[in-house]
A protein has these predicted regions:
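Gly/Pro-rich turn-and-neighbor structural signature
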Residues: 1-106, 215, 219, 223-247
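Structured mid-domain segments that build the active-site/substrate or prosthetic-cofactor binding neighborhood
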Residues: 85-93, 98-246
Length: 247
């Protein structure tokens, strides 16, 4: 078990939306002190022996880094031994990764990665739209930058997300096998996944067609999710956009 520290506001917002950056940082610092003290009193006097994490989502990331005028929580003693969970941009692209100077942090780093998101300005939910080469690109880069302690993905509902979730977990479990040298490894993974899940129900000659459907479908959704698609997304006659998509 890993205890999550910190605090967020209602509906995934900053706690004090109208306060200054310094006031928000001080509030989180006080929260961390209280939480660590409770852990010492109730679980273990040596708080460093208790697995802990704190997740810096998009609305709280600046509390960690601070600004030129206001020091953030980075390097704060209350975070010693705590896994620092960085976050993507809610759409599968990592926001920040640890610099060489940051990678010696006791507790290491983790990543909170979205395959499903409910929130503004647009939600994308319930439809498995994860493009494996994108996951490969972002998470292997995160691994190379030292993000290796905890990987979490938000998938909303498991149904329809099985394909992307399977790769994310297999990559986390054995990055040597599924990290590869480039994103082409995801083609091999797709073939294996299709064979395992559809091989008993379809003739071998049909499996490559299933692979193609899954790959093309998720590739198109990686460009534009259903919820954001509109009549002007692709031009029907100019620039070859419609023809390229329909090929």
């Amino acid at each position: 078990n890993v205890i999550t520290l910190g605090m967020r506001g209602e509906n995934d917002t900053a706690i004090m939306q109208h306060a200054t950056l310094e006031e928000n940082i001080q509030l989180i610092r006080n929260v961390l002190k209280t939480q660590n003290q409770l852990i010492r009193e109730i679980i273990n006097p040596d708080v460093r022996q208790v697995p802990r994490q704190i997740v810096f989502f998009s609305e709280t990331e600046e509390f960690f880094y601070g600004s030129k005028e206001t020091p953030g929580l980075i390097g704060d003693p209350e975070l010693d031994g705590v896994t620092l969970m960085l976050s993507d941009n809610n759409h599968g692209s990592t926001r920040t990764l640890p610099s060489p100077e940051m990678r010696s942090h006791p507790g290491g780093y983790g990543m909170y990665y979205h395959m499903d998101m409910h929130g503004g300005p647009h939600s994308f939910e319930w439809v498995g739209a994860t493009y494996l080469p994108k996951v490969w690109e972002e998470m292997t880069a995160a691994y190379e930058y030292g993000v290796r302690e905890i990987w979490v993905t938000n998938i909303g509902d498991i149904g329809t997300q099985e394909f992307g979730l399977s790769y994310f977990l297999d990559l986390a479990y054995d990055i040597d096998a599924w990290g590869g040298q480039d994103a082409a490894i995801t083609t091999q993974y797709t073939a294996q996944w299709v064979r395992r899940n559809f091989g008993a129900a379809f003739a071998p000659a049909n499996l490559p067609r299933i692979e193609g459907i899954i790959t093309d479908y998720t590739r198109l959704l990686a460009r534009k999710k259903h919820e954001k698609m509109g009549e002007n997304t692709y031009h029907p006659t100019h620039y070859g956009e419609a023809e390229e998509v329909l090929q």
